Regions:
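Active-site helix-to-loop segments that bind/position phosphate- or nucleotide-bearing substrates
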Residues: 3-120
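Flexible, glycine/charged-enriched surface loops at secondary-structure junctions
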Residues: 53-62, 137-153
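Short terminal or interdomain "cap/linker" segment that borders an active site or interface and mediates
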Residues: 98, 145-191
Length: 191
């Protein structure tokens, strides 16, 4: 296989984008009072202490026939992924996580305080997006003068989520960063 997964350089999380977190909660800044924002800040501090952000990636050559797209030996099913990668000769395959301790923290918090667990879950969504953004930036720095599309994942459009295990296996994500999939194709850790 042409995929030789690269372990990530370290990623340090910055303070999380509050507007993104509030959006995940279905809220606006105007709806959040000082007491709520203090609670959110406390949850963020705790979440960031537990997060161990990591990612792995590899760069794969793309080959096409009339109706089929391959990234290395991986068949990429669906019209949407083919359209997304139209004009590209390579694809970056990436997996990222905040680590299992974030899932454990959210699960434990859920047993004691559902509101804080909900806040932490939204914060974790914001945090994993930040990890992916920083990973993407680091990857782009290794490939100057290349065009990059936006990220596309199994489950988007008609790109089947059932492809998740194949992509993660190609990256050796279980060994590289500790990500596996469940029987229903969800990633574990969740974030």
């Amino acid at each position: 296989t042409a995929c030789n997964p690269t372990m990530s350089p370290s990623i340090c999380l910055s303070p999380l984008d509050r507007s993104d977190t509030l959006r995940y909660l279905g809220m606006t800044e105007a709806a959040a009072d000082n007491a709520f924002l203090s609670r959110l800040d406390a949850c963020e501090a705790k979440l960031l202490r537990h997060a161990t952000p990591r990612y792995t990636y590899c760069i794969l050559p793309l080959t096409r026939t009339e109706s089929v797209l391959y990234a290395d030996t991986l068949l990429l099913e669906g019209n949407d992924i083919r359209q997304h990668l139209e004009g590209c000769d390579r694809a970056v395959l990436m997996a990222a996580t905040l680590g299992t301790s974030v899932d454990v923290l959210i699960d434990r918090t859920q047993k004691r305080d559902m509101t804080n667990a909900l806040l932490m879950d939204a914060l974790a969504n914001t945090a994993i997006e930040q990890v992916c953004d920083k990973a993407e930036q680091q990857i782009q720095e290794t490939m100057p003068n290349r065009y990059f599309t936006w990220r596309f994942s199994p489950g988007y459009g008609d790109f089947p989520i059932s492809e998740q295990p194949n992509l993660l296996a190609h990256l050796n994500a279980a060994r590289q960063v500790g990500i596996i999939t469940t029987e229903t194709y969800l990633m574990n850790p969740r974030k």
